[in-house]
Swiss-Prot record:
It is found in: Cell membrane. InterPro entries: GlcNAc_MurG (IPR006009), Glyco_trans_28_C (IPR007235), GlycoTrans_28_N (IPR004276). Keywords: Cell cycle, Cell division, Cell membrane, Cell shape, Cell wall biogenesis/degradation, Glycosyltransferase, Membrane, Peptidoglycan synthesis, Transferase. The lineage of its organism: Bacteria, Bacillati, Actinomycetota, Actinomycetes, Mycobacteriales. This is UDP-N-acetylglucosamine--N-acetylmuramyl-(pentapeptide) pyrophosphoryl-undecaprenol N-acetylglucosamine transferase. Cell wall formation. Catalyzes the transfer of a GlcNAc subunit on undecaprenyl-pyrophosphoryl-MurNAc-pentapeptide (lipid intermediate I) to form undecaprenyl-pyrophosphoryl-MurNAc-(pentapeptide)GlcNAc (lipid intermediate II). HAMAP family: MurG.
Length: 399
C-alpha cells in the first residue's frame, strides 16, 4: 500500500537535527484513534517542534479523524486480529508481515524516534517493525498504552519488547503496566461543568434549574438504549426530568409524545449526533451510556454520575471498564438485557430527585477520573526517545 503514503511534514530525507519524530499506532475504532489524538495534542504542547505521524488503514475512522485534527496520516494494509483462536490465526503471519514491511517503510520515511501503540490491528505491525534486525535495522523504542480493562492481542504481543507500558486501569493483563488512565482530549479534561452550565443549558433549550439526563450510545448510537429511554419519556416528564438524547445518525427515535423546549413540559431533545460533547456534559446531571474505555474516561474525567450499560459482545471488556468508577461510587452498571423503560424511569428519577446522593456520586466520579493521562503518555514517549542510543548518535548527523 505504499502508493497511499504521503510525504511527511518536514520533507523526506532531511536532517531534522534534535526535532523528535513520533509515530502513533492507534487506528481502527474511535477507542484507538481518540486516545492517540489526545496524546498527539499533548506532544505538541510538551515539544512544539515534534514531528507527529499517525499510522492507520483505509478502513478505519482515522482517515477522517486524523486529518481533521491537523496531523499527518500514513496508511498500511489492515490485518484484523481475531478475538479468540480461529482459522484466521493460520492466515495471520503472511498478512501481518506484509503490513510489517509497509510499516518499516513508514518508520524509515519519517525517521521515527519512538512508536506509541494503542492496541488494535494497526499497532501489531508497528510493534514488530520497531524491533529492528541486528546488524541491518536499528531498533526503535516502543511505548504501549492499553485503554481497556482486558488487554488485546496486539498489546500482549507488544509487551514482550516494549520500553514502557501504561494502562487505564490496574490488572489489565499487561505485566508491569503503570496506571495513568485513558488519554482524553483537552477540551474535555479542561471542562468546568459548573462554569459552562448556564451556556450549555441555554444552547439545548433547558431551564437553568432543570434536572437533565444525557443519553448517548457512542458515535452510532445504541438501539437498546434508544428504545428503553424513549419509552420512559412520559414517566420522566412526570418527574420533571429533561432529556438530551443522541440516538445516532442511522437510528430513528420514536417518541409517543415528543416534547420541545417551547412546551411547558420538561423537553426531550433528540438529536442524531452531538458535535459539542463539552456542552452536553456541562448541561447534564446524569448520563446513561455504554462503557467503552473512551466513554468511561470522558464521563469520569468531567465528574458525571453515570448509569453504564455495557455492550453485550466481546469478552466482557465494557463491564470491566466501568467497574473502577462503579466501585468508587460514581456510577452503576445495568446489563443490556435488564435495561427496561421501568428501570430507566425508576433509577433516573430516584437519582435526580436525591441531590445529596447525586452530589456524592459526582464527587466519586471526579475522584476516579484521570485528567492528565495524555500528558503522562506523551512525556513517557519523549523521555524514552531522548534516551535511545540511536537518538544520541543522531544529534548533529543522520542515523
Amino acid at each position: 500500500m505504499n502508493d497511499t503514503v504521503r510525504e511527511p511534514a518536514g520533507g523526506l530525507g532531511v536532517n531534522h537535527g534534535p526535532a523528535l519524530s513520533v509515530v502513533l499506532a492507534g487506528g481502527g475504532t474511535a477507542g484507538h484513534v481518540e486516545p492517540a489524538m489526545a496524546v498527539a495534542d499533548a506532544l505538541s504542547v510538551l515539544e512544539p517542534n515534534v514531528r507527529i505521524t499517525a499510522l492507520g488503514t483505509s478502513r478505519g475512522l482515522e482517515t477522517r479523524l486524523v486529518p481533521a485534527r491537523g496531523y499527518h496520516l500514513e496508511l498500511i494494509t489492515p490485518v484484523p486480529l481475531p478475538r479468540k483462536p480461529s482459522g484466521d490465526l493460520a492466515r495471520l503471519p503472511p498478512r501481518v508481515w506484509r503490513s510489517v514491511r509497509e510499516t518499516r517503510a513508514v518508520l524509515d520515511l519519517v525517521d521515527a524516534d519512538v512508536v506509541i501503540g494503542f492496541g488494535g490491528y494497526v499497532a501489531l505491525p508497528a510493534y514488530l517493525a520497531a524491533r529492528g534486525i541486528p546488524g541491518l535495522r536499528r531498533r526503535i523504542p516502543v511505548v504501549i498504552h492499553e485503554a481497556n480493562a482486558r488487554a488485546g492481542l496486539a498489546n500482549r504481543v507488544g509487551l514482550r519488547t516494549a520500553d514502557r507500558v501504561l494502562s487505564a486501569v490496574p490488572d489489565s493483563g499487561l505485566r508491569g503496566a503503570e496506571v495513568v488512565g485513558v488519554p482524553v482530549r483537552a477540551a474535555i479534561t479542561a471542562l468546568d461543568r459548573m462554569a459552562l452550565r448556564a451556556e450549555a443549558r441555554a444552547h439545548f433549550g433547558f431551564a437553568d434549574d432543570a434536572r437533565v439526563l444525557l443519553v448517548f450510545g457512542g458515535s452510532q448510537g445504541a438501539v437498546s438504549l434508544n428504545k428503553a429511554v424513549s419509552a420512559a419519556a412520559a414517566e420522566l416528564a412526570a418527574s420533571g426530568v429533561s432529556v438530551l438524547h443522541a440516538h445516532g445518525p442511522k437510528n430513528v427515535l420514536e417518541l409517543l409524545a415528543p416534547r420541545t423546549p417551547d412546551q411547558d413540559d420538561p423537553p426531550y431533545v433528540a438529536v442524531p449526533y452531538l458535535d459539542r460533547m463539552d456542552l452536553a456534559y456541562a448541561a447534564a446531571d446524569l448520563v446513561i451510556c455504554r462503557s467503552g474505555a473512551m466513554t468511561v474516561a470522558e464521563v469520569s474525567a468531567v465528574g458525571l454520575p453515570a448509569i453504564y450499560v455495557p455492550l453485550p459482545i466481546g469478552n466482557g471488556e465494557q463491564r470491566l471498564n466501568a467497574l473502577p468508577v462503579v466501585n468508587a461510587g460514581g456510577g452503576m452498571v445495568v446489563a443490556d438485557a435488564d435495561l427496561t423503560p421501568a428501570l430507566v424511569a425508576r433509577e433516573v428519577t430516584g437519582l435526580l430527585t436525591d441531590p445529596p446522593r447525586l452530589a456524592a456520586m459526582t464527587a466519586a466520579a471526579a475522584q476516579v477520573g484521570h485528567r492528565d493521562a495524555a500528558a503522562q503518555v506523551a512525556q513517557a514517549a519523549l523521555d524514552i526517545a531522548r534516551l535511545a542510543p540511536s537518538r544520541r548518535r543522531a544529534v548533529g548527523g543522520r542515523r
